[in-house]
Amino acid sequence: MPNISLSSRCNLHCPYCFAHETMGAGSGDITLENFDAALEFLTRTGPVNIGLIGGEPTLHPHFDEIVRRAVACENVAMLTVYTNGLLIEKHADVLSLPKVTLLVNWNAPNELRGGAFEQIKRGVDELVFNRDMGRRINLGLNLHGESMEYGYMLDLLKRYGFDKVRISLTVPEFPEGCGQNAIERFRACKPFLLKMFADMDAIGVLPYYDCNRPPWCIWSDEEKQWLRDLAARHGADECTLVDTESFCRPVIDVLPDLRAVRCFGMSAFEKVDIRDYANVNELVAHFMRRIDRPAYRIKAMPECENCHLRRTWLCCQGCMGYKMVEIEKMNAERGE
């Protein structure tokens, strides 16, 4: 799903954020003219789901107008607002419009200050209990180490009666984090993930992965069967927890100045002007050639050498940002 970044500003400083490269830089807030141009570009080939991101998108001074414009666009099938939740009560009227869904990345109480946790709760309460938006809100949990406190999230999921939660295994800022090995990190997180999944299953919640999904090969046969059984209990035999394929394709994030990146994880690699491309498909093809093609040729571990999934672009072995330096070298060798 392509995204439009409304602002490079944010009212939090999350330890796991990989968007610092664009935060507080560039042109700040997107102009309404540029928003209209970005929306037209992304929907030029037909109906599509669009995300509003940041920074924190709700900080934009014309956020309500932007949401209304996007909802009114007949080629916007669904509009997802990615938010930390601090200002959703203020914008409840537009956030409850048709087509709008929310992904609330809700940090732990010890990571929030000055009543921020309760402020987020008031906003979600308003949308769920007074605006009947329970089926249009997802909560997000961001794992930025090998473990974390997640009891608060279990309480929130029970409070709102939610039956799913997004799990994001965050990545370091690139290119500084390129020396790390994604597979080793996934393996280190396994005990924690299995315990957390079991605790979520116990309250009727099915977790699902964001990008940077662990490859299926990190699990033992016993663990694979346990995950299959968990998914089956929720009637979700094809959910991300048991998907044998672990890959991503260019997302396309349009920045306030109308430059685009493949995704925030690769934002330091290359930014291109959307006005130089006929449509979003042409832009995707550009990033596939410049980033994805070399990325799938790079082996994260020796055992990846003969992996059929890697060879057929169905396992990217974690976020491509880990391979950024190697991708640049391969492109240079090809004269790009």
Please report, for each region that a protein language model flagged, where it lies by residue.
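Short, solvent-exposed loop/turn segments at secondary-structure junctions
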Residues: 11, 57, 87, 109, ...
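Disulfide-bonded cysteines in secreted/extracellular proteins and peptides
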Residues: 10, 14-17, 217, 239, ...
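Short acidic donor-binding/metal-coordinating loop in glycosyltransferase active sites
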Residues: 6, 54-55
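N-terminal [4Fe-4S]-dependent radical SAM core
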Residues: 1-3, 44, 285, 289-290
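Radical SAM/AdoMet-radical enzyme domain recognition
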Residues: 32-53, 60-186
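Flexible mid-to-C-terminal extensions adjoining Fe-S/redox cofactors in radical SAM and related proteins
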Residues: 259-336
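Canonical Radical SAM [4Fe-4S] cluster-binding loop centered on the CxxxCxxC motif
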Residues: 1-33
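A C-terminal junction/extension of Radical SAM enzymes
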Residues: 174-268
